[in-house]
């Protein structure tokens, strides 16, 4: 039925459908709400056909299958790259870490603090200059991940210090990543990094230095900035990040095979039990 439905649409129309469904895709929405969006998006398909489809699958599963095959958006690239990164058992990985005025798509903490910014074939480079300025202030190595056909174009928007990773899909639908240019080691700005942290994060670092936390965020920030003038606390900052994201990353790694691909980031953030979420959707389907 899946192929039968899609056969009524051109590839271009399917991409537009994927864009619509991806825009506000939310795993916490009720299954019936997502199905209403699917009905709206597949405007050539009868309600009866969609109702029959609902008996075969649940909305998350249908949207995931659609995205993986037809729409290599950021969620899809993240899934494939995380699948690649999780093989390094001693590394800690985080999503959407705030730094300055930017949010890095993927942060990797091993011996080095690494940033990975994803630019898909559907993205432009309008904000890349600002993003790169923030990333080079906060990460020891910075990479940009782009489609293989954009490897040359993107070089006009990044410095020679930035590494380039390309991706492509093979005939089996597997995503192949290749390091086209190595990232050069970069000296970070600890003051900039500390300024990007929340009040609670600053308190944890203060305590890790065996100091007494002060009353306000600004006071704790000034305390740490003063300490940073006297000694190098970069390793302490990196250790803090590793501890901050370790539990979430280990949870995602441990449940990776139970989670639908484009749902990975949501489960990283929430640590929700995938068995419970998807079982709820399956039970709803069984009641139709």
Residue ranges and their predicted role:
Residues 1-49, 245-288:
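Nuclease-adjacent, charged terminal/linker segments that flank catalytic cores
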Residues 54-93:
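Acidic-basic catalytic patches of nuclease active cores, encompassing PD-(D/E)XK
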Residues 81, 106-108, 112-121:
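Conserved catalytic cores of phosphodiester-cleaving nucleases, focusing on short active-site segments
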Residues 95-100:
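Long, charged, glycine-rich C-terminal linkers/tails
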Residues 110-112, 168-172:
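Short acidic-glycine loop/turn motifs at beta-strand connectors
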Residues 122-168:
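Catalytic cores of nucleic-acid endonucleases
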Residues 172-245:
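A conserved mid-domain beta-alpha-beta active-site/ligand-binding segment of alpha/beta enzyme cores
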């Amino acid at each position: 039925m899946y192929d039968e439905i899609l056969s009524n649409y051109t590839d271009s129309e399917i991409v537009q459908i994927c864009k619509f469904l991806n825009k506000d895709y939310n795993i916490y929405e009720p299954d019936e709400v997502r199905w209403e969006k699917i009905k709206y998006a597949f405007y050539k398909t009868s309600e009866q056909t969609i109702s029959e489809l609902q008996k075969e699958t649940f909305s998350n599963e249908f949207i995931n299958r659609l995205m993986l095959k037809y729409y290599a958006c950021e969620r899809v690239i993240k899934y494939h790259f995380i699948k690649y990164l999780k093989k390094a058992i001693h590394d800690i990985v985080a999503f959407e870490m705030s730094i300055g005025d930017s949010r890095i798509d993927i942060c990797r903490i091993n011996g080095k603090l690494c940033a990975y910014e994803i630019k898909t074939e559907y993205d432009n480079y309008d904000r890349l200059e600002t993003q790169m300025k923030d990333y080079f202030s906060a990460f020891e190595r910075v990479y940009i991940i782009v489609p293989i056909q954009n490897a040359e174009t993107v070089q006009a928007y990044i410095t020679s210090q930035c590494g380039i990773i390309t991706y492509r899909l093979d005939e089996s639908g597997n995503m192949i990543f290749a390091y086209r240019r190595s990232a050069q080691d970069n000296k970070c700005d600890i003051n900039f990094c500390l300024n990007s942290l929340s009040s609670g994060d600053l308190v944890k670092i203060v305590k890790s230095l065996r100091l007494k936390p002060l009353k306000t965020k600004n006071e704790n920030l000034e305390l740490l900035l003063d300490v940073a003038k006297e000694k190098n606390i970069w390793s302490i900052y990196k250790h803090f990040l590793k501890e901050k994201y370790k539990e979430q990353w280990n949870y995602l790694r441990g449940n990776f095979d139970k989670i639908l691909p484009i749902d990975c980031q949501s489960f990283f953030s929430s640590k929700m039990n995938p068995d419970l979420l998807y079982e709820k959707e399956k039970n709803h389907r069984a009641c139709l």
